[in-house]
Each structure stands twice: as structure tokens, then as C-alpha cells.
Amino acid sequence: MWTLDYDGSMTLRLPSEELEALSISSFYKLSLKRYAAEIADGIMRFKPALTYLDYKKIIALCQKEAVRHQTELVVSESLRAYIDNRELHLEIRSRLGSELKDRDPKLRERFEAYRDTVNAGMARKLREQQMWDSFFMCAMKKSANFSVPGSGKTASVLGMYAYLREKAAMHRIVVVCPKNAFGSWMDEFTACFAGIEPLRVLNIHAPQYKTQQQRRTALQYDAGGCNLILVNYEAVGGVLDALEQLMDTGTLLVFDEVHKVKRIRGEYAENALQLARNARYVVALTGTPIPNAYTDIYNLLHILFPDEYDECFGFTVPQLRNPRDADIAAVNTALQPFFCRTTKEQLGVPAANADMVLQVGASDTENRLLRILQMKYRKNKLALLVRILQLESDPRMLLQALDLNDFRYLLDDTAETSEIDYADYSDEVRSLIDNCEESSKFCRCIELTEKLVRQNKPVIVWCMFVGSIRRMADALGARGIRCRCVFGEVPLEERQQILNDFRAGGIQVLLTNPHTLAESVSLHSVCHDAIYFEYSYNLVHLLQSKDRIHRLGLPEGQYTQYYYLQLTYQTEDGAWSLDGAVYDRLREKERIMLEAIDCHRLERMPTSEEDLDTIFGGLF
């Protein structure tokens, strides 16, 4: 008789001579060995990390082999009970998520009690939809919030904290997020708990913590009195041991902009997984859960459910990388109960005005340079994209060497590229570039910005290149316009001061780029006009940049206006605009995302290669 049992892990017991024969059999080598941990004292013990699904597979395998050996297989009551309990646990968890999202009437009384507790503990009240999202995250303990950028995800998390502070002695939030989101978390905490709980923040990137050891020491000795601890993704690995010591029952762990954790089994993913493993409450926030492919959810789900992933989901990396329609349907069905997602429309944010697209005709010189670039880079569309953007900003940039790896932020995915272009143009072309005046598009942007400023409207101008930002600052400054720049080289403390000055009215124009300032910065209280001088097909950056001025908190009737500058060239095949092609692509990707939200599924966005093929479809 063979006996399968459970005593903390699965075991197989059989007579010693049969066990010895089994251990050298082809059945063991081909079927069981991958699951086995050790064989000793007449017992085969299976790996402790196996899931109940693995146990069911082992039972089926052993049943077939027992029949072949004409012996009885007994599955113990303890093993059956463990499997049944796991199935029931996951079923209950999944059912609760669905009931919360459907606002099941039987949960109404508990929701109202939750709402009363949260409202009593917050100075700034949550909207009804935000309160349901907060209730969902609290009840699920580990979940994701995929609400669109600008829909108040941070406040919903703070509502969860307010409830747990009152009911479960929670005393701090640890937030892992990009540095440029630190200010938003501090501002939101201060606003939500004004007069109730003062902000006591530990920012491990503050100037006084210059070394890794100083940061680790701060977490060990200064964190106890803090209610908000801020760490960026890059720094987690260096202070992981100190952070893990904080993961007690009084800590809420938040991963904000969790789409930053892209690469499967990469450093960010492994650190996040380790940190989340012992946390009781974990929330993952992102407005763009699947920016590129379904593989993007692999890390997210492992962070939230490290021990349950195989049982709850079980999707392999190859399966997520190239999903069939059936796989996509299965992923969405399995994932639905574990995330909430709210649109700005549901929260009553007034709709933005229709985009104002401003067409600018290219000069003869610009048309000639486009033809040269078209011939030179027809086999490298990313290089062509970057070079045309440079032409439209400052043609002199075409004479500089180009390392395409420096422009990966233009992409929506993590495609690797290391090609370097050394810009070996002929003397004739160099002369053409040297004698080129300011680009037509640049002049139109300065004109539009000045017009809006003269109407007493604060303005954000979005660029891609730091060179564009600096030249635009010089041009606007020469016209007496007060402007400041925010890009990667600007220290975090200086960025925060610039943003505060902009909000206070000391700055008329803010010049920046999406990969520096697109995330988690709120400027909607003072600014309602944004100009896009340069833009790429990175939908994440576009949506997040738009939401700096269009987000929860806008009063009814408040306008929001976006301006897109588009330079139009004359080619042999007629008029063509890179800006126009990119803009159309972005609108299509945004439509796909919003349609997916309406249909309650997670969207998959095109790859960068597909984007480039579409954008240059009208040029080649």
C-alpha cells in the first residue's frame, strides 16, 4: 500500500524495498523527481514550496503508477483537508473581490461602518467611488488599484490607512515609488490628515542621508516615530534588510507606479518580492497595468501573492509573452477579483476640452533635411524618429553623435538598443544645418506660450530634449517671461521648490519633460493649459503628463486645454507629419485603454516596433 500524507509538506510512504525500487525507476526520474525534496527513513518528502495544484498532480501520477503496480494508493484525510482548505480559501478570496467590486448589498452595512471610521479620521473626505476603492483594498489586504492617473489613488490608500490606524493599530505607511512622487505623497498626507495627524516623514533620499549606511541607520533608528517612509525603487536593494524589519502588522506597504517593476526576475522585482513577502497589507498602484504586454503583470502578481501565484493564476512567462485569445480571457477572468479600477468620469472630473492641434508648415530647408534623414535612416526607424525630433527642435543637434540607448524613454517597452550614430554628413549638409534658422515649430511654440502668458494663464510646456527646454527658457526669458526648468539633472529639493513657486504664481511657465515630471505631481489647482512641443508614442508618459493638470479636485466647469504642435513636411508623396502620425497613434492607444476599462478587461498595448511601423507607414 502507498500512502500520501501531509504534515506541513506532502509525503509518500511505502515499503522500503518498493521505495528503493521506485527511486531508480523511470517513473520517478521522468515524473516525480521534479517535485521531490528528499528520500529518507522510508519516506519520500516533497518540496515545501509546492502548491495544492502540484499536490493534485502528484496524486494523479501516483494513482496511475499504483494501478500499474497493482497496489492501493491511500490519500490521507489531512492531505485531503489541506487541499480542500486551500481551494476554499482562494475561492472565498476571489468571491470577496468580486462581491466588493459589484457592491453586493450584503456588504453595505460593513461599507457604511468603514466609511464612518474613515471620514472621522480624515480632514479631507473621499468621494463615494474612492471610498469603495479604499474599502476594497482594505478588505482584500493584498490587492492592486489600476485606476487611471489623476483619479485619486493616493487618497484612497490614505483612507485605508485611516481605518487601519483606528481599528488595527497601524502606525505607518512605507511607500516605494519614483523620487518625483515623494512630494505628492507628503502633500496628500498633509492635506488628508490636517489637524488630525501631523506628517512625520522619513525620506531616505533627503540631503542628510548621503550614503547607503546612513540610510540604513535612519531606517533602523529614526523610522519608529515616522508615519510615512519614502524609498525609491533603485534604493530598495541597498536598504532591504532594514526595510524588512519594518514589515510588522502596523505597517502598510505601498508600491506606487508599480509598472516600473518591469523586467521579470530583475533587481527591482526581486527586491520588491522579498520586501512584500512578510507584509500583512500590500497595495500596488498604477494607472497603466499593462503598458506593453501581459508579462507586465507577472511581477505585480508575484509581489502581491508570492505564495499563491501558482494556485491563483499559474500563467507561465511564455504563455504571457505570446498569449492566445483563450489565455487573455483566462488572465482577465483570474485577475478581475484582485484589482479595482476607477475612471475620472466616475469621479465627476470635468472633461477636458477637445485638443487644439496647431499645424506648422516646414520651411524649404526643413523639407530638404527631412529627405536627407529619410534616405540615411530608412533602415533604422528609431534613429529616424529621434533625428526628426532633433530637426524640429534644433537642427544643429543633427551634428551630434547619437546613442540610441539614451532615448529608450521614448519607447513604451524595454526593447534594448545600443546603436550609436556618429552623424557623418557631407559638407553640403553640414552647411545647410549650420545656416538653418530657428525651426518653424520652435518659433510657433514660443509665440503660443507668450500669448497664453499675456492672458495671465500659467503654462506647462512639455519637451523631450533637455536642449529644447534650455533653449526655450532662454527665448522666453528674453521676452520677460518668468520660467523655470525641471529635468533629470535638477536635484529633487530644487524641483520641489520650483513646483511650489509655480503653484504660488511666482513662475509663469514650467518647462519640463514627461520622463522626469509625468508621475504623481498635482498642478491642476493653478494650471489649465499645457503645450506639447515634442512628444513620443510612449502612452504612459502622455497620459501621466496630461493628468498633471486634469485630475480629481477640479471644480465643475473648469476647462483643461492641451495644445499639440505639429510640423508638416512636403514629401514626394504629399504632406506628412511625424507629430501627426505619433499623435494619431497615441489617440488610438488611448482609445484601446479606455475601451478596455469599459469592458472590464486589461488592455495590451502595441510594441515599439509596431508603433514605428505605423508611424512611418506614410513616409516609406
Named regions from a protein language model:
Residues 2-143, 191, 196-199, 226-228, ...:
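Charged, low-complexity
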Residues 230-247, 266-280, 284, 303-405, ...:
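Inter-lobe coupling linker of SF2 helicases/translocases
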Residues 537-546, 550-620:
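A conserved SF2-helicase RecA2
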Residues 170-172, 187, 195-205, 224-227, ...:
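Conserved P-loop NTPase motor "coupling/switch" region that bridges the ATPase
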Residues 202-213, 233-238, 262-265, 463-467, ...:
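Conserved helicase motor
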Residues 156, 170-191, 293-296, 464-466:
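Conserved Walker A/P-loop ATP-binding site and its immediately adjacent core
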Residues 237-240, 292-294, 469-471, 510-532, ...:
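SF2 helicase motor core recognition
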Residues 107-108, 148, 152, 156, ...:
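Conserved Helicase C-terminal RecA-like lobe
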